[in-house]
Structure formats: structure tokens, C-alpha cells
Amino acid sequence: AGIGGGGFGGTGTVTITDNAKVDNATGGEGAAGIGSGVVGNVTVNISGNATVNAEGGANGAGIGGGYASAGDVTIEGGTTVSAAGGVGGGAGIGGGADLAGDEDTRNRVTIRSNGDGSPNVSAVGGAPEPGQDGEDASKGGAAIGSGALIDPDEDAAEADADITIEGKVTISAVAGKDGVAIGANGKEQAFDGLLPGSSIDRRNTD
């Protein structure tokens, strides 16, 4: 990853807090901008008044999982976060591409306000995996949630996403092509009970 774990089993925790500024953390092929490499397991915590800009490498999330890796990301407080998933179906914030679902494999994303303030988050899902024949080999990734499967079987499901959004938040979520803005497996997740002044803007890629 640009910041975080290496590939094939790299683990750990990335904590970005206080007034930290992270400009243009970019993942290499298969890696998240911030988070894990290929088949890694890294937790990312962004808090305080940190400002973070991250972009995934091919098949990686902007912030979260690399290729075939789940994302575990918490963003809280007066943070400003911009994250773009890598080409090949990485989520903006959440999972890398090609992570199939089972009961134990889930992406986790929490975005919430606290005493430090309310987060402002902009996330864009990665573009589809290019196929050999000009056709897309995957959907685009979710802006916040799960990465897309590459050349999936008909009944295959992406790893699900446990997404918690609480308090006062400002979120812009642009789905990758044919993906979802906030959610997984074609389902947009709804959020109730947010504080006044919150805004969640969901869009599809043009």
C-alpha cells in the first residue's frame, strides 16, 4: 500500500490523527492507497482534524483493502478525506476488487462525528476491470463499501459491507460504473437518524 501493509499477508494498523496531512497516498498495483496490499489485512483509523487524499492502485481501494482484501476503515471527527478506488473495481473506501463473500469476510466502514467535529468525506469507486474484448470484466467499485468481482460466476456475491454512518457528516459518494454509491452487491444502504446539517450525496458515474 502507499501507506500500510505489504502484500500477501501484510497486517497492521494505520492511524492518522491530529492535524496530519496526507497528500496523494497512492497504492501500487493491487494495493490500496492507504491500507493493505494484495491479500492483506490492515485497519485504518483517521481522526482528529486530519486531511487525507488517497488513491488505490489497480484493483485496490483508495482507503481500505488491496486486491482480494477486506477494508476496515474508521473516519471520525473533523477530518477531510478524499479517496478514489483503483481501476478494476476497487472501492473508494472499503474493499479491494475480487473479494468474494462468505460469513467471515466483510468490509467494515464507519464514518461519524465526535467532539473534534464532523467529517467531510468524498469517495469515488474505481472504474471496471478492462476485459480483453473491449467489454468490462467487472463492474465499478462502490464509492463506500465493497469492491467488484472480476469475471464473476453468475451467482457469486461480493464480500458484504458493514457500513455505519453516525452523527453529523458530509459525504459525497460517486459509484464506479454500474456499482453502488454506498453499499455492496447492488444494494444501496440507507442511513437514518443523522444529525441536522448532514448531507449524503450519492451519484452514479456518468
Regions found by a protein language model. Give the residues of each.
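Surface-exposed loop/turn motifs in large extracellular/passenger domains
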Residues: 1-27, 34-56, 63-86, 93-178, ...
